[in-house]
């Protein structure tokens, strides 16, 4: 019988807002059991000064005391979930300080969340699954180098990517639009194998991730089938050579995007967009089509243009495109329109996603859209900081899957 992962819940307001039961439901669904570090009033008063600033909320004082109890080894917690209300600025400050203290003084994985009164278990599943994965595969996620010959497959909603790695180097890649999940994976894999100059029989380990990971994993008899949050984080940190310390990953995909805060290449904060495609790669595809250029050409145009010359009244993919078309009809230059599209995406990611995570340097931009030069410039301007775009930035999921799956090599060799 599989043992439940013990997750210490540090929260303020989850009980009275009705969110606690949703957190509990999400934890149970992925094999987690919530526990509460026990502290008494005298202990709360004793440790309060260690926070470094005065806290008004009694619930936040309790949350901090429970965190200190974890640090002092008074619980059998295997992971920590920190959650505070999105309306509370004091809560956000304490949440981040608690996160830092736990990471600096323990080896426990931490995931943070800012909840609303309407938060449902379905919204928490990805975070809870990542948390239990980190506990159950801790030694695997500590892997910093790929060994042998491994294949990683990222079966996404828009594109399917495959990467062959040989002795810590990317040897072959495959990238195609997703149609049929299995057929798309087979084609991407064949392209990667061909470029690497090997056959599937020579591959020692296989890892899958992405929306179609279970279907593709079953077909290829994968050694590793893992959710994309931990896999993408590992792939991005590995490619950027930032596997130690803090970092932020911004992943702009075909239909959605993610902002992930990392500590030692493991995610501890995460938000996903997807309600509006106006901040995704799809927006760039439509803009490029309107301008009659390729995506790469769109990126080059955007790098030369001035977004300030184009008036955009909406981030929406429909109305945003209408604004760009109107500007073209009025004689606007193509490069200015391209720059406006890039700036629109950068602003939307900043305003709607990066407000929900702790943005830490270095910032790593990945996903297919990271290859657009104009978007990189726009992101640096909006964020006011330097952006890292590693080689193979569009293939982080497949690279992460190949890297992590190689951890099963010795186990298979001994079998």
Swiss-Prot record:
Q: Which Gene3D superfamilies match?
A: 3.30.420.40
Residues annotated for [4Fe-4S] cluster binding in this entry = 276, 316
The UniProt keywords, alphabetically, are: 4Fe-4S, Iron, Iron-sulfur, Metal-binding
Give the cofactors, semicolon-separated: [4Fe-4S] cluster
Q: Which superkingdom?
A: Archaea
- InterPro entries, sorted: ATPase_BadF, ATPase_NBD, CoA_E_activase_dom, Dehydratase_Activator_Redct, Methan_mark_15
Q: Which GO terms describe its molecular function?
A: 4 iron, 4 sulfur cluster binding; metal ion binding
| Cofactor: binding comment | Binds 1 [4Fe-4S] cluster per dimer.
Assembly, in brief, is: Homodimer.
Q: Which NCBIfam families match?
A: CoA_E_activ, methan_mark_15
Q: Output this protein's name.
A: Uncharacterized protein MJ0800
* Source species of the chain: Methanocaldococcus jannaschii (strain ATCC 43067 / DSM 2661 / JAL-1 / JCM 10045 / NBRC 100440)
Tell me the organism's taxonomic lineage. Archaea, Methanobacteriati, Methanobacteriota, Methanomada group, Methanococci
């Amino acid at each position: 019988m599989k043992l439940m992962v013990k997750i210490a819940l540090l929260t303020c307001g989850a009980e009275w807002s009705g969110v606690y039961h949703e957190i509990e439901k999400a934890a149970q669904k992925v094999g987690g059991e919530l526990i509460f570090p026990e502290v008494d009033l005298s202990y709360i008063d004793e440790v309060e000064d260690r926070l470094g600033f005065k806290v008004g909320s009694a619930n936040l004082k309790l949350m901090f005391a429970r965190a200190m109890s974890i640090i002092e080894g008074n619980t059998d917690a295997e992971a920590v979930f920190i959650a505070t209300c999105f309306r509370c600025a004091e809560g956000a400050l304490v949440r981040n300080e608690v996160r830092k203290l736990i990471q600096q003084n323990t080896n426990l994985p931490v995931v943070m969340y800012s909840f609303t009164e309407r938060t449902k278990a379905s919204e928490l599943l990805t975070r809870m699954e990542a948390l239990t994965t980190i506990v159950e595969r801790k030694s695997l996620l500590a892997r910093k180098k790929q060994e042998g010959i491994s294949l990683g497959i990222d079966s996404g909603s828009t594109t399917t990517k495959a990467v062959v790695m040989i002795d810590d180097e990317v040897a072959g890649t495959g990238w195609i639009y997703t149609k049929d999940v299995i057929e798309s994976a087979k084609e991407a894999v064949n392209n990667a194998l061909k470029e690497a100059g090997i056959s599937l029989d020579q591959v020692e380990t296989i890892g899958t991730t992405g929306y179609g990971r279970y279907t593709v994993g079953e077909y290829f008899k994968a050694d590793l089938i893992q959710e994309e949050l931990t896999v993408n984080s590992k792939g991005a940190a590995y490619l950027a050579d930032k596997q130690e310390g803090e970092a932020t990953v911004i992943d702009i995909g075909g239909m959605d995007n993610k902002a992930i805060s990392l500590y030692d290449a493991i995610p501890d904060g995460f938000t996903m967009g997807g309600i509006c495609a106006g901040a995704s790669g799809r927006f760039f595809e439509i803009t490029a089509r309107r301008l009659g250029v390729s995506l790469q050409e769109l990126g080059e145009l955007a790098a030369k243009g001035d977004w300030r010359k184009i008036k955009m009244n909406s981030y929406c993919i429909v109305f945003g495109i209408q604004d760009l078309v109107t500007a073209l009809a009025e004689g606007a230059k193509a490069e200015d329109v391209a720059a406006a599209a890039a700036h629109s995406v950068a602003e939307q990611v900043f305003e709607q996603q990066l407000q929900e995570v702790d943005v830490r340097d270095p910032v790593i931009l990945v996903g297919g859209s990271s290859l657009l030069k104009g978007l990189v410039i726009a992101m640096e301007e909006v964020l006011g900081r330097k952006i890292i775009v590693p080689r193979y930035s569009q293939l982080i999921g497949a690279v992460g899957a190949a890297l992590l799956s190689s951890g099963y090599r010795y186990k298979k060799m001994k079998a």
